[in-house]
């Protein structure tokens, strides 16, 4: 008949915690505090900014609001493959505190030391993208935090509001199946 049995993994490893998830307007103070909190526990941060044309300006802005000892590196899909690989290896090695990047971190990354995810313009992304990005943090015993920002003063359309509400509501580990339903 072509029908196959389906197996679901309903329990995460015992040492993992649900990711603390926040959906809010973008705020420099919140961004600074989130990055500083992660730095204080010797962790790293993903900052997803999905606009290559203005990513340098965002890096400059972050450097203005953060202390000088916070190191930021940029990564995006238009970079030369070897350059991108070197940046990612340096980030994995702990040489940078913040990886300012496009959605290229959506899949396949396992950096247990990165436990804070900041996503700019999250309202412009699909639910599966947002869910996958959130899954890049919380891959160790540390409590992870994910912040999904929309622009200050922006009125969200109904569909975007529903996506962000869903990601905020379903925070327990393994909630992907519930989100898909």
What kind of feature is each model-predicted range?
Residues 28-44, 50, 54-57, 61-181:
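C-terminal helicase module of SF1/SF2 nucleic-acid helicases/translocases
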